């Protein structure tokens, strides 16, 4: 028996994977702005563009009209999942507001800072929907393809609203997916943003053949950078040793399905950033938000040498091996 109505906004790899999981238990509607993609999904029961080879559940429905999708998740016992990238979150919030169809409860799954404003996702939502309160972030170590295949995964929903946490738990906590709850929205979002930048660093190190010792050092010292920035922005230190901090960092920094790690590997091989991004075909949020992370860190007086090295390679033309050498030349310090 289908137990609740859920609308998923965004039919990329992650939105499709989450919708596939939800549709096993719930009346789930997957929205995409591209009507041709919606028709293709309905006809093939497969998202060949973003998640090829994964059969989608027969009960999953598809929609190209945003108002219809939002109407599906209006009730107090429903849930809306925003699966757009950070760059599209603000526009979707405005569209919900302008349509006067803001869902009672919604969560977003994007990770990063808005490039031009340096806002975290919850700050964008608060600016666009100031009269709404029941929302939060769903995050954690997860690759879309594995979720779509029904492999085990653990995620965290963080929200100031108990009702939002309860709705999200009721929607997602079944099968091979385990959901934890909390209220440290800032900590969860900072972890999700910074780990993408750090994954580029580990990709560079692995691509240069620097070994597993170097990878371990980058992950642990990167975690220290993440925690320092997160605490400076109002997050709690313990959040960064959990799923959305250390867990997500380990996965993104070491997993072969990681787009950000792939960017680092290819930079180490001598490819230009423009060529890498053109060939990737998907979002690499670490590239998008690296400047914002470093800018905020400098503004707050937070030392983030690994992030600085990544930005030097991405944007200043510094050779990957020279950036690593710069890190090794840093003065010794207490841990």
From Swiss-Prot:
Binding annotation for NADPH: 14, 33, 111, 144, 259, 283, 285
Keywords assigned by UniProt, alphabetized: Cytoplasm, Lipid biosynthesis, Lipid metabolism, NAD, NADP, Nucleotide-binding, Oxidoreductase, Phospholipid biosynthesis, Phospholipid metabolism
Active site feature: 195 (proton acceptor)
InterPro entries, per the entry: 6-PGluconate_DH-like_C_sf (IPR008927), 6PGD_dom2 (IPR013328), G3P_DH_NAD-dep (IPR006168), G3P_DH_NAD-dep_C (IPR006109), G3P_DH_NAD-dep_N (IPR011128), NAD(P)-bd_dom_sf (IPR036291)
Pathway entry: Membrane lipid metabolism; glycerophospholipid metabolism
Catalytic activity, reaction form: sn-glycerol 3-phosphate + NAD(+) = dihydroxyacetone phosphate + NADH + H(+); sn-glycerol 3-phosphate + NADP(+) = dihydroxyacetone phosphate + NADPH + H(+)
Subcellular locations according to the entry: Cytoplasm
Superkingdom of the source species: Bacteria
Molecular function (Gene Ontology), one example: glycerol-3-phosphate dehydrogenase [NAD(P)+] activity
Any GO CC annotation of this UniProt entry: cytosol
One BP term from GO: glycerophospholipid metabolic process
EC number per UniProt: 1.1.1.94
Residues where sn-glycerol 3-phosphate binds: 111, 140, 142, 195, 248, 258-260
Family annotation (Pfam families): NAD_Gly3P_dh_C (PF07479), NAD_Gly3P_dh_N (PF01210)
Record function comment: Catalyzes the reduction of the glycolytic intermediate dihydroxyacetone phosphate (DHAP) to sn-glycerol 3-phosphate (G3P), the key precursor for phospholipid synthesis.
HAMAP family for this protein: NAD_Glyc3P_dehydrog
Family according to the record: Belongs to the NAD-dependent glycerol-3-phosphate dehydrogenase family.
Name this polypeptide is given: Glycerol-3-phosphate dehydrogenase [NAD(P)+]
Organism: Burkholderia mallei (strain SAVP1)
Gene that this sequence comes from: gpsA
């Amino acid at each position: 028996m289908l137990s609740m109505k859920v609308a998923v906004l965004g039919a990329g790899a992650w939105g499709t994977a989450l919708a596939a999981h939800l549709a096993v238990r719930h009346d789930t509607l997957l929205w995409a702005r591209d009507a041709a993609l919606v028709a293709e999904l309905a006809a093939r029961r497969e998202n060949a563009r973003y998640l090829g080879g994964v059969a989608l559940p027969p009960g999953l429905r598809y929609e190209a009209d945003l108002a219809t999708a939002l109407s599906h998740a209006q009730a107090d016992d429903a849930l809306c999942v925003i699966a757009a990238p950070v760059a599209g979150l603000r526009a979707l919030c405005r569209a919900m507001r302008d349509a006067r169809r803001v869902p009672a409860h919604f969560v977003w799954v994007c990770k990063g800072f808005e490039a031009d404003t340096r806002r975290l996702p919850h700050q964008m939502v608060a600016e666009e929907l100031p009269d709404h309160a029941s929302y939060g972030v769903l995050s954690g170590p997860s690759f879309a393809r594995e979720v779509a295949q029904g492999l085990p995964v653990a995620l965290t929903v963080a929200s100031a609203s108990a009702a939002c946490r309860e709705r999200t738990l009721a929607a997602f906590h079944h099968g091979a997916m385990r959901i934890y709850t909390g209220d440290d929205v800032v900590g969860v979002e900072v972890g999700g943003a910074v780990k993408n930048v750090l994954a580029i660093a580990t990709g560079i190190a692995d691509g240069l053949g620097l070994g597993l010792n170097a990878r371990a050092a980058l992950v642990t010292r990167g975690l220290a950078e993440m925690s320092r920035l997160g605490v400076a922005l109002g997050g709690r230190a313990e959040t960064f040793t959990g799923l959305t901090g250390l867990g997500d960092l380990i996965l993104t920094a070491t997993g072969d399905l990681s787009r950000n790690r792939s960017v680092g590997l290819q930079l180490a091989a001598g490819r230009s950033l423009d060529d890498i991004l053109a060939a990737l075909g998907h979002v690499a949020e670490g590239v998008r938000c690296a400047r914002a992370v470093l800018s905020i860190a400098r503004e707050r007086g937070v030392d983030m040498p690994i992030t600085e090295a990544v930005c030097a390679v991405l944007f200043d033309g510094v050779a990957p091996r020279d950036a690593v050498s710069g890190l090794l030349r840093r003065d010794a310090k207490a841990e």
